[in-house]
């Protein structure tokens, strides 16, 4: 959770009250590791400012390890989201260099630790340079934070996407860049939720669509199929 704070005394049922806010990742396949990243936050004496975070998880499909980064950027304004987008890109680019959450040689004291318990289920392999970054980014495609992630538009056509950057799966799969609405801004339809796929995985994008009938949220879910 990006926010996990006491909300005062116990509730009517006697249980502690808490303010909690964060991201959830569910997988049919085993989650091999996860990392929790806090994103830059701005203090505010006006609109409510909440600590935002990103949850990075690794899952192997058909022998290939994928990284998924699930996030929810601030609703405040573009100026407060840009540092968060920059941090997401830093996390992505440095992930292979930082390696697995637990890696390297294991040193234990058998008398104190009772054996080589850290070595049980020790993570192996390398961190994938490719990732899928998805969630509620609270921004439309004409904003600076979107451009940071996908690259600037060129007058010669298309976006100048860096090989270490991301493509917008909705657009890459043939979706209308001006459509795919998932929510609204001031009662105007808007696309705020995305599945960004690292450039190295772009050819794996098979389909991307918005479930317009789902009733579970004030935002509509975005589905992505990789093949």
Tell me what each language-model feature is.
Residues 2-227:
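Active-site regions of metal-assisted phosphoester/phosphodiester hydrolases
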């Amino acid at each position: 959770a990006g926010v996990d704070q006491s909300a005062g005394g116990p509730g009517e049922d006697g249980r502690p009250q808490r303010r909690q806010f964060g991201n959830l990742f569910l997988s049919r396949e085993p989650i091999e590791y996860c990392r929790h990243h806090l994103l830059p936050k701005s203090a505010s004496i006006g609109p409510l400012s909440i600590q935002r975070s990103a949850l990075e998880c690794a899952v192997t499909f058909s022998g290939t390890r994928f990284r998924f980064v699930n996030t929810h950027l601030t609703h405040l304004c573009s100026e407060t989201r840009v540092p968060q987008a920059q941090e997401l890109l830093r996390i992505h680019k440095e992930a292979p260099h930082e390696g697995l959450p637990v890696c390297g040689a294991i040193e234990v004291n058998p008398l104190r630790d009772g054996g080589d318990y850290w070595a049980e289920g020790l993570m192996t392999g390398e961190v994938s340079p490719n990732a899928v970054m998805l969630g509620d980014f609270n921004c439309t495609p004409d904003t600076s934070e979107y451009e940071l992630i996908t690259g600037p538009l060129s007058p010669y056509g298309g976006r100048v996407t860096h090989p270490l950057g991301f493509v917008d799966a909705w657009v890459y799969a043939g979706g209308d860049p001006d459509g795919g609405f998932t929510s609204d801004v001031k009662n105007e339809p808007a696309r705020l939720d995305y599945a960004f796929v690292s450039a190295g995985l772009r050819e794996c994008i098979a389909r991307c669509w918005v479930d317009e009938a789902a009733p579970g949220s004030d935002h509509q879910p975005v589905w992505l199929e990789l093949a």
